Curated annotation (Swiss-Prot):
Name under which the protein is recorded: Pimeloyl-[acyl-carrier protein] methyl ester esterase
A UniProt-annotated Pfam family: Abhydrolase_6
Keyword terms: Biotin biosynthesis, Cytoplasm, Hydrolase, Serine esterase
Family per record: Belongs to the AB hydrolase superfamily. Carboxylesterase BioH family.
Entry's localization field: Cytoplasm
Keyword Hydrolase (UniProt): yes
Biological process per Gene Ontology, one example term: biotin biosynthetic process
Residues where substrate binds: W23, S90, L91, F152, L153, T154, L155, Q156, H244
Gene this chain is encoded by: bioH
Pathway(s) this gene product operates in, as recorded in its UniProt entry: Cofactor biosynthesis; biotin biosynthesis
NCBIfam families in alphabetical order: bioH (TIGR01738)
Residues annotated as signal peptide: none
Functional note: The physiological role of BioH is to remove the methyl group introduced by BioC when the pimeloyl moiety is complete. It allows to synthesize pimeloyl-ACP via the fatty acid synthetic pathway through the hydrolysis of the ester bonds of pimeloyl-ACP esters.
Length: 263
């Protein structure tokens, strides 16, 4: 029996722009920005393996030490259009970094939204979360997905001036599709825990745009400032009073930055 392909929704006309969502999410989370971006680009919204409408697209290998799971990278490469721009949110941004390194002839530019080279705090990296906190979260996720995900969404909007508006929208969008496969959640967690991409950023030759909320509590804004010093060709758009989901909090600014950079 053949391997199930990833689900990709394509819409709009123009340069190819690929959107990659974060851990435990799906491509529907981009919300109304999908239609807005489709006015400027040929948009490709990917559901990562085991997520959203790609629930059957398994197996899913464990995260490699110091790198995104090769399996995840390979699965996205299969659906990647030539000469594209990749916009990755959170963990999807780490995947965009790996794709830019692996497919330099196909990836023209990358946009890293609310991304960090390491989500985990390390001895020489203070702008991450405690490993025990992430492991406890994963255990709670296994026990009660719905309740734990609602808490995770609350964390994502924390620090934003419009959390009261964005949180209900995120909840509505998340539960429009089925929960991710447990195997995909576990593999994603292993990637989050293992990934440390700091040493790879200087090897990125593509122009890079960083879009970050200055009050992000998941991907610390200091991580974005640090990344700005590492890339060869980079811009940083730091959005004030913004959390981990700038595309829902400030869609107009988010879209304007992408159109200016990627068109």
């Amino acid at each position: 029996m053949g391997q199930v392909s990833l689900y990709v929704e394509s819409l709009g006309e123009g340069p190819d722009l690929v959107l990659l969502h974060g851990w435990a999410m799906h491509s529907g989370m981009w919300g109304s920005t999908r239609r807005s971006l489709a006015q400027h680009f040929r948009l490709h919204l990917v559901d990562l393996p085991g997520h959203g409408f790609s629930r059957g697209a398994l197996p899913y290998k464990r995260g490699e030490k110091n790198g995104v799971s090769e399996d995840m990278v390979e699965r996205v490469v299969e659906v990647l259009p030539p000469d594209c721009v990749i916009c990755g949110w959170s963990l999807g941004g780490q995947l965009a970094i790996e794709l830019a390194l692996r497919e330099p002839a196909r990836v023209e530019k990358i946009i890293l939204t609310s991304t960090t080279p390491s989500f985990v705090k390390r001895e020489d990296w203070q702008w991450g979360m405690e490993e025990l906190t992430l492991k406890a979260f994963a255990e709670n996720l296994r026990r009660d997905f719905s309740t734990t995900m609602k808490r995770f969404l609350t964390l994502q909007v924390s620090g934003g001036g419009d959390a009261g508006k964005v949180l209900p929208e995120m909840r509505r969008l998340l539960f429009e599709r089925s929960a991710p496969e447990p195997e995909a959640l576990e593999a994603g967690l292993q990637i989050v825990l293992a990934n440390d991409l700091r040493g790879k950023l200087r090897n990125i030759v593509q122009p890079t745009l960083l879009i970050h909320g200055e009050n992000d509590v998941i991907a610390h804004p200091e991580a974005a400032a640090w990344m700005k010093q590492q890339f060869q060709d980079v811009e940083l758009a730091m959005l004030p009073n913004c959390s981990h989901v700038p595309f829902l909090s400030y869609p107009d600014k988010f879209i304007a930055n992408i159109v200016r950079f990627a068109r």
